[in-house]
């Protein structure tokens, strides 16, 4: 009797789930139903040599999702820094417009992409960006490492709506576990290997083909948390600068974090000399490395701790010329040690940027010595360059 009752309950639940799914599908717009028909397919890689675009490069926009995972006050600041592209379902767009308008967001800087999403973690499922060997801007997609099918479609929908070159890289990945230097280097935890069958050769090859990564720093996660995302403990601030969290010697992850910091201090950056490693104190697992660099501003999550101001000062010391802004959490979506501001936003690089490449002088020279700098300038806007 008990077994039969259980079977009946399961049957009723199954029917209710099917009805709910049908009702949800019927609320989709025609455009959103078309979006659901897109499926991931690996494409040919971009024309080599490929250059990955770093977070600290010029950005035209920032990608967020509504309902929000960030405070409305941050949306106001983002719209004063770049364009804001908001992913929202058609049924919720008016709600988003009302919330943004009431908060004082500059709506001239806001545009919408209508599609259904499963979560607000645009960092994790959003597109990655490259310039190919012909200087053409493009989106690199991947298989999102979470069972969120709507989120997994966002890079394709984004590329389609903005008419961008699209490349599908058949690796299971997540944006919170990826950072690059804008030259040839990427850093990730070894989650990338374990989620791709521990086939390191395959992962390394695809990262090179699709993103131009020739210097690949893959390390164990020193935080030893469930998520294994690198943005929970480190951040590239420039091609030769990396920020890594620090903790007291009594902290259970002290040894692992110090070992990782030493590893990066002994690695050469793309410019041929060791990384300058900056440390930010996180004794209570504060998410200070989980920040967003957007043009010349750095938005840092703060938690009302006495460690907030010293953390902001670390950024100011490491990044002269940037405005460093502390952002308090929304009570409904608080910052967490494994999920904060960086996880819920995603910069969109400027496809028309002026890209200037030169290797900084790093050694001591005598006074009066002439120095020759070789500089390569690319106007991705297609506009001519003028000599001075």
Model-derived segments and their meaning:
Residues 1-4, 24-30:
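Enriched but not universal
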Residues 26-355:
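The feature marks the mature, well-folded catalytic cores of soluble enzymes
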Residues 2-13:
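Bacterial N-terminal signal peptides that target proteins for export
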Residues 12-21:
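Bacterial N-terminal signal peptides
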Residues 7, 16, 60, 293, ...:
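Serine/proline-rich low-complexity intrinsically disordered segments, especially terminal tails, linkers
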Residues 349-388:
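Glycan-association/targeting regions that enable binding to alpha-glucans and other polysaccharides
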